[in-house]
Regions:
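Glycoside hydrolase catalytic-domain context in secreted enzymes
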Residues: 1-735, 741-757, 762, 766-767
Length: 767
């Protein structure tokens, strides 16, 4: 027995022993993830039994490198992958396909090295029968990391059951410009909230088995003009204050992978930035996993290097360990021959890959048990719908029109109107597989489910981006004969409307043209926009419905912070739901009915107009205010805002100390304690948030920064004391020498909920 075959040895030692046995070609093969897994097979039916046939391209790739490092997207299903329930992998066939692929690799690998599988999981597994969650932006609105952790624990069990080694999860992007099409993949505009959610998602997923590849590093949410993959024109301090905290949190939580971002920062692509991929995440943050490329990103370095071989060498030297769909990493042998990279540098990356394979037990247990179902029942695993419930945000509730109690609605006629009222894919978000209709609940479905004693009437009213006179007239007639109106508006990241795609899967703007029904993917990867208003057709519909004199509740389902100024002027009640997932319609109906107490808080600020962007709350505290001569100051709705149905009485708030030195702060922290009482007749949530403002410092500070929060449930009439803790980091800054320090001085402390200040105090940090 050779050392690498000895399971009693440490994974790192086995990896080193195996590396010594490998040829250069075999090493290069371990760093490649060139294949699109969904294209390596064809599904066939032989004698009534489903099976797959592996492609010649796959066979040649395995032969070329005597093995395979990582295979992307074997289970991926969506219009870009061209896989659905007829052509893709589902049920037992998924596990059989995994075993067939793994068996072929092992049998054609000279050293018997198994392949690792990576799979998209931005909000649940992008696979047939994948357990789907609301998008990250809604998860951020829950202000409930424990719920996010629980949801990803369920998702992780499914991925583990399917043999997925790497869950590719969006969590590092901080949303600074809502024009960006991938806004939905961000948790927040705030680094602290984003970091807490990233930490929870990593822990939840990895508790169930798969390793997390956290993406994207870094500053992809800061693209110029909100354009995808465009330059982030910021400096090191902005990177450290805003964009690094989620990565640091994910790494601290145990993430084994980091995916580099497409964009460049100050003229250097992230995939060619050794300071980012080595100095920051490895030396400063202590990361010891693999750095993965984003799709075709290494080849895109050709625009800078002019030579694909040089691009591969540059990415490797900069810290990328594993490629994705690129040609450049397949040419690393040539790079060695040309003296562009040393074999020792390749060895370092290969060691990381092999160590993970040993840690995951793939050498001893390379195959899956083929029995058992992969489908996860949403009713028995309610974490997805619970996320949706907690993440819906009430923006307006004129005269307490909400909730519309079920007994109050009994026998009433309820009109459910709008282009997003009964379109399942429009509430799911991007990176979504085909979904079995029985697994989804639209708003129309949800209203029928909850308001069983009411007469539910549906009318579409218009298309997403196109007016239709007949649909509009039908909707107005329906509303005239109804008692209350639920008008469901918004956008769509659905890839199921005839869009075409780039080589990396991003939707192409030129070809994603609206069909005769005006269906258009207006959000998601590649769908950046210059106007954040709802389309004219939808605003006209809302106005026409309100002119009937009926009470109108607007529900907006979308993937980015929109300008909802007109919507809030017209409607009596407004509910915002960032793509709430497959059971989102149920959650919305439950909130409307009062079965669920709304508790979502905005994880982003909503602008009054597109020209007001950027409108994030934590801007720099310079002597000039962030105002315009032709627009009201401040956002339409600020970060942290969200209404509920209950009333709460806040009592005395106090600090554990009003003055201490850095050593004492580091040892004991600062505790903010307050009492609160639910004075309403039903239970409900509060979401207390602590903001800190540095009054005087050596660098320009922000007007305020979120440093702590907690989601707290109070039964009717219940009173309790809540305590929130601030550590030393809450008072630290990056000084002029770019050192992370706590400077002595005065800090303002603010306690708020739903953007309402409850208490303000001061704390002094001494030398």
């Amino acid at each position: 027995m050779k050392a690498y075959q000895d399971a009693s040895l440490a994974p790192s030692r086995r990896a080193k022993a195996l590396l010594e046995e490998m040829t250069l070609a075999e090493k290069v093969g371990q760093l490649n993830q060139r294949l699109y897994g969904f294209r390596i097979y064809e599904r066939k039916c032989v004698n009534g039994e489903d099976s797959i046939e592996l492609s010649e391209e796959f066979r040649q790739e395995v032969e070329k490198y005597s093995g395979l490092g990582v295979l992307y997207g074997l289970y991926r299903a969506d219009p870009w992958a061209d896989k659905d329930y007829e052509t893709g992998l589902t049920g037992v066939l998924s596990k059989k396909a995994y075993n067939q692929v793994q068996r072929y690799v092992l049998e054609h690998s000279r050293l018997g090295i198994p392949v690792m599988m990576s799979s998209e999981c931005p909000h649940g597994h992008q696979a047939l029968d994948g357990y789907l969650l609301p998008v990250n932006l809604l998860a951020g609105a829950t202000f409930d990391p424990a719920m996010v952790r629980a949801a990803y624990r369920v998702s992780g069990r499914q991925l583990q059951n399917m043999g997925v080694d790497f869950a590719l999860m969006s969590m590092l992007d901080v949303l600074r410009d809502p024009r960006w099409g991938r806004s939905e993949e961000c948790y927040s505009e705030d680094p602290y909230l984003s970091a807490r959610m990233a930490e929870a998602a990593v822990i939840g997923m990895q508790e169930s088995g798969p390793e997390v590849v956290a993406k994207h590093f870094a500053a992809q949410g800061e693209g110029t003009g909100g354009v995808n993959a465009s330059a982030a024109r910021i400096g090191e301090r902005e990177l450290r204050e805003i964009h690094f905290p989620p990565a640091a949190a994910a790494i601290k939580a145990g993430a084994k992978g980091i995916m580099a971002a497409y964009n460049e920062i100050d003229g250097v692509y992230c995939h060619a930035n050794r300071w980012l991929l080595n100095d920051v995440i490895r030396k400063e943050m202590g990361f010891d996993g693999i750095v993965m490329s984003d799709g075709v990103a290494i080849d895109q370095l050709d625009s800078m290097t002019g030579d694909n071989v040089v691009s591969g060498a540059l990415a490797l030297q900069s810290g990328v360990d594993v490629g994705l769909w690129d040609e450049a990493f397949g040419k690393l042998e040539e790079a060695v021959r040309r003296g562009l990279v040393k074999e020792a540098q390749i060895d370092q990356a290969v060691l990381r890959v092999l160590t993970l394979k040993f840690e995951r037990g793939l050498f001893e247990h390379p195959y899956l048990e083929e029995e058992g179902e992969i489908h996860v029942d949403y009713a028995q695993n309610p974490e997805s719908v619970q996320l949706a419930r907690e993440g819906l945000v009430i923006l307006k509730n004129k005269n307490q029109v909400l909730p519309f109690w079920e007994n109050q609605a009994s026998g009433k006629k309820i009109a459910v109107v709008g282009p997003n009222a009964d379109d399942l894919y429009n509430q799911l978000g991007d990176y979504t597989p085909p979904l079995r209709r029985d697994d989804g609940i639209t708003v129309l479905d949800g209203m029928k489910l909850i308001f069983k004693e009411s007469d539910i009437r549906f009318s579409q009213g218009c298309y997403l981006r196109k007016r239709d006179e007949n649909l509009l007239k039908e909707a107005v007639d329906t509303v005239k004969n109804s008692d209350i109106v639920i008008c469901v508006l918004g956008g769509s990241s659905s890839r199921f409307g005839g869009a075409s795609f780039d080589t990396n899967g991003a939707a192409l703007l030129d070809n994603a043209a609206a069909d005769d029904k005006g269906t258009l993917m207006d959000c998601g990867e590649g769908m950046d926009c210059s106007d954040l208003e709802l389309p004219d057709a939808q605003l006209e519909l809302l106005k026409e419905l309100k002119e009937t004199g009926k009470t109108v509740i607007a529900v907006v389902i979308c993937g980015r912070p929109l300008v909802l100024t007109q919507v809030c002027e017209i409607a009596d009640g407004v509910i915002l739901g960032f793509y709430p997932g497959p059971r989102g319609g149920q959650a919305i109906a439950e909130v409307i009915s009062g079965r669920v107490a709304p508790s979502g808080r905005l994880p982003v600020s909503l602008p009054r107009s597109t020209g007001q962007v950027p409108v994030y709350y934590n801007y720099k505290n310079s002597y000039r205010a962030m105002t315009y001569m032709d627009e009201e100051a401040g956002p339409l709705f600020p970060f942290g805002y969200g209404l509920g149905y209950g009333t709460f009485e806040w009592g005395t708030c106090s600090l554990s100390t009003e003055r201490c030195n850095v050593a004492a702060l580091e040892n004991k922290g600062l505790t903010i304690s307050f009492s609160v009482k639910n004075t309403s007749e039903r239970g409900g949530y509060i979401v207390p948030q602590i903001y800190v403002t540095d009054v005087a410092a050596s660098t320009v500070r922000r007007v305020k920064e979120l440093k702590a929060f907690q989601k707290v449930w109070l039964d009717a009439g219940q009173e309790r004391t809540v305590s929130l803790q601030l550590g030393k980091e809450a008072f630290c800054l990056w000084n002029q020498k770019m050192k992370y320090v706590a400077e002595p001085g005065v800090f303002r402390i603010e306690l708020s909920d739903s953007a309402q200040t409850i208490w303000k105090g001061e704390f002094t940090l001494c030398i």
